[in-house]
């Protein structure tokens, strides 16, 4: 993954985290996004890509199970962040898939 792609993802997760802290501060979803953001900042390469792709799945399931209803701002940020999953296409390179 290119450095600029990693930066886009970090910025998107940061923006979502900020919004969740404002509108849903005491939810597991908010806490998970914040913890994952800290972890993503420490990772590079395939470890970063794998962690981000896992995060997308788990965060979505957690949000659904908690019945967190996103407002318009959060929804736009969530979709913007989720759209970046295509940047993780390098994850399976060389695995014959």
Q: Where would I find each of the regions flagged by the language model?
A:
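Amphipathic alpha-helical interaction modules
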Residues: 20-63
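Intrinsic-disorder-associated interaction segments
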Residues: 2-5, 9, 41, 45-48, ...
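Amphipathic alpha-helical binding modules
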Residues: 57-97
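Charged, amphipathic alpha-helical oligomerization/scaffolding segments
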Residues: 8-15, 32-35, 39, 54, ...
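Short terminal alpha-helical segments
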Residues: 1-30, 86-97
């Amino acid at each position: 993954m290119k450095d600029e792609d990693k930066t886009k993802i970090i910025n998107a997760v940061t923006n979502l985290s900020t919004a969740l802290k404002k509108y849903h501060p005491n939810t597991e979803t908010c806490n998970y996004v914040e913890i994952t953001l800290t972890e993503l900042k420490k990772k590079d390469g395939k470890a970063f890509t794998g962690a981000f792709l896992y995060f997308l799945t788990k965060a979505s399931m957690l949000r659904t199970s908690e019945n967190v209803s996103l407002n318009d701002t959060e929804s736009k940020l969530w979709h913007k962040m989720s759209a970046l999953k295509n940047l993780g296409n390098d994850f399976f390179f060389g695995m014959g898939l």
